[in-house]
Amino acid sequence: MKLIVGLGNPGFEYEHTRHNIGFKIIDKLLDVLNLELNKSQFNGLYVKHDDFIIAKPLTYMNLSGNFIRQLVNFYKIQIDDILVIHDELAFNLGVVRLKQNGSANGQKGVANIISQLGTQNFKRLRVGIKNEDLKNIASFVLSKFAPNELILLESAIASASVIAYDFLKSNKSFSKLMNEYNQ
């Protein structure tokens, strides 16, 4: 059973912020698969299909790990079958990269997941949100995208949803996916 979780913050006020790009990608993936989040459990929303689960935590980003840990335990999901989609401040807007494992790189939602799962050996799909205005990081990640950024944003969401779909539906190894998409 594979698990894809998009990170973001719940609530209308955060809907179009940089921090919620993980939610946006989940929405696009659900559209492609003609699915909707239909289960509410463990303080999150998800849909369980035959061999995968797609989910969004309903906690604030920095507390996402508890929801993921509960899904993993309940459905007996292997750590190697988890893909977490999140914003990446280290990448320019529009850059999309897969990562096998490793540190949180300052991303507090990922840090909480590492803490809750007791491992950093889960897969990530990191989506760049950086622009040149990084005076206050906390304010920046909770800011909305500027009109001139929307084309790059839509392109990143489309690319990331294709990668997430490939993770779910193909039999390619993660190394092969990284070689194919991390260019």
From Swiss-Prot:
The keyword Ion transport does not apply. The record marks 87 as: Stabilizes the basic form of H active site to accept a proton. Belongs to the PTH family. Monomer. GO terms for cellular component: cytoplasm. The record marks 9 as: Discriminates between blocked and unblocked aminoacyl-tRNA. The active site is at 19 (proton acceptor). This is Peptidyl-tRNA hydrolase. Keywords: Cytoplasm, Hydrolase, RNA-binding, tRNA-binding. GO terms for biological process: protein quality control for misfolded or incompletely synthesized proteins; rescue of stalled ribosome. It catalyses: an N-acyl-L-alpha-aminoacyl-tRNA + H2O = an N-acyl-L-amino acid + a tRNA + H(+). Hydrolyzes ribosome-free peptidyl-tRNAs (with 1 or more amino acids incorporated), which drop off the ribosome during protein synthesis, or as a result of ribosome stalling. It is found in: Cytoplasm. Its EC number is 3.1.1.29. The gene is pth. Its main location: cytoplasm.
